[in-house]
């Protein structure tokens, strides 16, 4: 399952960064549990699960439509697969795919629609047919509907179900996963401190995220933690006493306005509260 990196397109996703991050993840092999409070596209958790199958894995995301997708992928993958195959076969052209995209967006935005399978189908459809991979914040992309909303991608979903079958998946606030257990490794990929609001309904999960409180929360616990952030002196100053590493990271998405233009020149910052040896500097 080497080709199984993430079933989703997600802004800030780490599918291309896992190999560069591996040297900072060496501590994981000594642990019994892996936790990820901001699951997003899940590429790091999938990478860890495949590389360290002995670990108990607890993943979480506060964004409910995303959480719901992962739960359905885990618990009802056959129905998800069959429904998406049927929809793709009936909407093969961009014109009909756009109609499906708009209906899916309307369905997902109506909070009275609580059928978990249909909401997961709608989320996946929007994710694959949009410019950015976002839901409420996205617009339809003809190119994405053809290249990303594909039978090939849908056919890979059962493979992801096998990988995540033993995950504990929750929809709670990140701090509930923090702990003092030194045999629990925690990887945190919070909303970045940037100008654009990418996550949640109308960007609420970016706009409303308290970065100062997040730093204080992480600093209170002694379990090994690795945090991904946008590199800035302000971020580093919040994590006094933590070790840092940086590497270049170019994302594949180019369609979220000024945010993505800025990404071409930025560094990925890693903060960690444990010792490492033999680190290699990546460019």
Show which residues each predicted segment covers.
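Short His-Asn-centered micro-motif
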Residues: 37-38, 60-61, 170-172, 188-190, ...
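Long, positively charged, glycine-interspersed low-complexity recognition regions
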Residues: 205-283
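Conserved S-adenosyl-L-methionine
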Residues: 30-92
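Short active-site oxyanion
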Residues: 31-34, 54-56, 164-167, 219-225
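Short, solvent-exposed loop/turn segments at secondary-structure junctions
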Residues: 41-44, 63-65, 129-132, 174-177, ...
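Short loop/helix-cap segments at secondary-structure boundaries that form the rim of catalytic
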Residues: 51, 178-182, 234-241
């Amino acid at each position: 399952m080497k080709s199984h990196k993430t079933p989703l397109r997600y802004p800030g996703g780490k599918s291309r960064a896992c190999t560069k991050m591996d040297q900072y993840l060496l501590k994981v092999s000594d642990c019994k549990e892996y936790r990820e409070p901001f699951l997003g596209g899940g590429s790091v958790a999938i990478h860890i699960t495949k590389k360290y199958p002995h670990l108990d894995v607890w993943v979480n995301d506060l964004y409910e439509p995303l959480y719901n997708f992962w739960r359905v992928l885990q618990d009802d993958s056959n129905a998800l697969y069959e429904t998406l195959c049927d929809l793709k076969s009936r909407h093969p052209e961009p014109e009909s795919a756009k109609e499906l995209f708009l209906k899916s967006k309307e369905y997902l935005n109506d909070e009275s629609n609580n059928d978990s399978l249909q909401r997961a189908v709608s989320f996946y459809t929007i994710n694959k047919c949009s410019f950015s991979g976002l839901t409420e914040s996205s617009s339809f992309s003809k190119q994405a509907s053809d290249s990303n909303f594909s039978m090939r991608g849908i056919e890979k979903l059962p493979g992801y179900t096998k990988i995540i079958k033993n995950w504990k998946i929750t929809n709670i606030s990140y701090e509930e996963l923090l702990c003092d257990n030194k045999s629990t490794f925690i990887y945190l990929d919070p909303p970045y401190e940037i100008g654009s609001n990418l996550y949640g309904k109308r960007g609420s999960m970016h706009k409303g995220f308290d970065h100062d409180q997040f730093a204080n929360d992480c600093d209170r616990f002694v379990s090994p933690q690795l945090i991904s952030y946008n590199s800035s002196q302000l971020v580093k100053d919040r994590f006094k006493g933590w070790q840092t590493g940086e590497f270049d990271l170019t994302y594949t998405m180019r369609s979220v306005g000024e945010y993505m233009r800025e990404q071409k020149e930025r560094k990925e910052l890693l903060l960690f509260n444990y010792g490492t040896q033999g680190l290699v500097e990546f460019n």
